[in-house]
Every structure is written in structure tokens, then in C-alpha cells.
């Protein structure tokens, strides 16, 4: 472990390499990291505090709101609105775009996040995480941010990543120049560089998909899953792994290689996919590509997609480049 390098030092080093940098991005990350530390503390004490279970509310996604979901969302909104570098935010838990109040300084960054991905698993102590995406508002724009400024393709992201709350708390992020991982050392309260320039293997031996939905899939999706049940090109038998927490399944795929799939199916509301583009599919696709991997909707590149709404859902196939391409080749036969 490169324990001598903190995330702040790493960010400042990156800032020095960019002559046009103003320090606003580093400031944004500082507040984002502080928010994650607060969330991590509550996640680690979840069994001892009154933060397990649901609130009784239903969010914009039609999902039951968990107490920790609500807590994480409030922490991020409170801390980030006061960062002085944002002009707007969007959260999985809110129907509308959240504009930074005129009572606070505003910048030109837009933060989009899923405050606690996988929160339905928190009661059984499964890894959860915070996924984030950072955009910059369009040049020349002033005043309140409009929705069209947020509906950008993933290729326009300034940075993206996630915090993973598990046996340890990790930050994995990219600003378009490599993917780096940091592990929180609770004894000093700092994220320390633990994974430098992460590269996903070209081909993996793990496929991850919820096969409980087999009866609801179309023919190309079934064929793709059957493909991964066969030995790989290296004649190695693949293993199936599915946690059910997107950020946990993706993190394993990033480090070990393979493919994670969340395809569309013919259930009500899932015909165009389930994962939210702006706060789930797009940021993870940005991480995957910067680590040498790939991400598609099964056929087309995820980062090229232009979302139509704040909570636009899409299918996702993400992971090792060869494995994602194999799925695309199967889908192309049925195009």
C-alpha cells in the first residue's frame, strides 16, 4: 500500500500538472470526501443506531426509502451546497434538479449522485456505496442552471467515481487520467492511496447478472448469458457472482475483470432498463473506460448516450473490453 500519499496530496499533484486549474475541483472533492466520511461512520454503526429499515416513504423511482438513504442524501446536499463551487445538484432521491441557493457562493460544477446505492441490502450487512458524477455547466451560461445543461452524454463528465462502504471504506475515482483507489485509514481519518492506475483485465472469468429474471429477458440477452456459461477463450470455466449491490458488483468487476449486466426485460417499467443513466450507468462507464474497460447498453457505447430526462433509465453491460464486445456481437445479430 502506498500509505504515504493522501487523497488531498494526490489531488494537489494533479492540480499542479494542469496550468489552467483554479483549485475549485480540489475544493469540491474535499467536501465530497468529508461527506463520505460522515456517511461511512453511520454505515459502520448501522446495527447500533436507529438507522436500519425504511422510512415508510417512496422515492421518485418508486422504491422504498431506507433510513440510511435519507441520511446520506441529506449529508451530501447540506455539505455540497456550501462548497462554493457548485451551481446545481441532482440526486436519485429527488424528482427535480436541485439548484444551489443564492444564499451560498456558486461555481460552475454540477454534482450528480446516488447517495447510497444498494441500501436495500444494508440490513444484512452487504456492501453499499455512493456513486457520483461531476459535470461542468456549458460555457457562457449564467444565472440558474437549466435542465438541458445537466442532460449531457457521459463523455462530457469532468470526473466520476464511487465510495464503497464495506470491510473498509474506499474511494475510486477518475478525472479522465487513470483510475485511482484510496482506502480510508480510520486511525488518522485520511483516504490513503492503495490502488494506483487501476486497469481492468481485457477478459475476465466472472459474469454477474441476476438470472432470476431469465423468463423476462429477450433472446439476445439469454444468448449472451449462455455464452458466459461456456469456457472462456483461455479455456477457463467462468464463475457467476452477483451481490445485488451495483457498486459492489462493479468494484469486483473492475479489479478482477469479467462482465456485469443489468439488461432490460419485459417487466413493467423495466423495458428500457432499470439503472439511472446520470447517477449510475454514466459515472461507472466513465470509470470503466478510463481503466481500459468498456460499457454499452448491449450494443451502443454508454458514454455516447444523451439522456432525455433526469431519471432516464438504461440497460448496462460493463466490464472487460473483450467480454463487453462479445455481448455486443451477440446483440448485433438480432439488430
From Swiss-Prot:
GO molecular function annotation: fructose 1,6-bisphosphate 1-phosphatase activity; magnesium ion binding
Binding residue positions for substrate: 117-120, 210, 242, 274
Binding-site residues, Mg(2+) 2: 114, 117, 280
GO cellular component: cytosol
Reaction catalysed by this enzyme: beta-D-fructose 1,6-bisphosphate + H2O = beta-D-fructose 6-phosphate + phosphate
Keyword Magnesium: yes
Note describing how the cofactor binds: Binds 2 magnesium ions per subunit.
Principal location: cytoplasm
InterPro entries from the UniProt entry: FBPase_C_dom, FBPase_class-1, FBPase_N, FBPtase
Coiled coil spans: none
Residues at which Mg(2+) 1 binds: 92, 114, 116
Cofactor section: Mg(2+)
Known pathway: Carbohydrate biosynthesis; gluconeogenesis
Entries under CDD domains matching the protein: FBPase
Subcellular location: Cytoplasm
EC number: 3.1.3.11
One GO process term, biological-process aspect: fructose 1,6-bisphosphate metabolic process
Keywords from the UniProt entry: Carbohydrate metabolism, Cytoplasm, Hydrolase, Magnesium, Metal-binding
Similarity comment text for this entry: Belongs to the FBPase class 1 family.
Record text on subunit structure and interactions: Homotetramer.
Protein known as: Fructose-1,6-bisphosphatase class 1
Gene: fbp
